[in-house]
Amino acid sequence: MNRPEEHVSPLIKRRYPRYELETELRASNLGAKQRGVMRGRSLNISEGGIAGVFTTGWDVGTSVNLEFSVPVTSYPVSIEGVVRSHTDYQYGFEFVGLMPGQRELISKTCRTLALLE
């Protein structure tokens, strides 16, 4: 008996689970093309990256500094990232070069958000 393929949400078919996180997301280019800080909104976060919406943006492969708030600390998180995807105004950033403390903070954030789902 053939079964039709079930639709699986893109949030489920990822290397890391995604968790909804709505907060201000600030990004600035690293390197030669400085445009200042761009402000957007985050959509979701995982241990590997964060997705957000911006009215203007970057090409895939662009290195950026990301700054955003998380529910497990009172100070903003600042992490280096790379644009891995974008569709219209939505951008996917992969975290790169995480220090152990940053990695633990993102992991703790994801564990906390998982409990809130």
Placement of each model-derived feature along the sequence:
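A residue-level detector for short acidic-glycine micro-motifs
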Residues: A27, N44, V83-T87, G97
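Short beta-strand-centered aromatic/proline hotspots
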Residues: M38-G40, V77-R84
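Short solvent-exposed strand/turn elements
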Residues: W58-V60, F93-T112
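Short, solvent-exposed secondary-structure boundary/capping segments
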Residues: I50-F54, Y89-G97
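N-terminal helix initiation/capping motif
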Residues: M1-I45, R111-E117
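Short conserved beta-strand and strand-loop elements enriched in small hydrophobics
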Residues: T23-L30, T62-S74
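Residue-level preference for beta-strand/loop junctions
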Residues: P17-Y19, Q34, V60-T62, Y75, ...
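Short, surface-exposed secondary-structure edge patches
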Residues: Y16, V53-W58
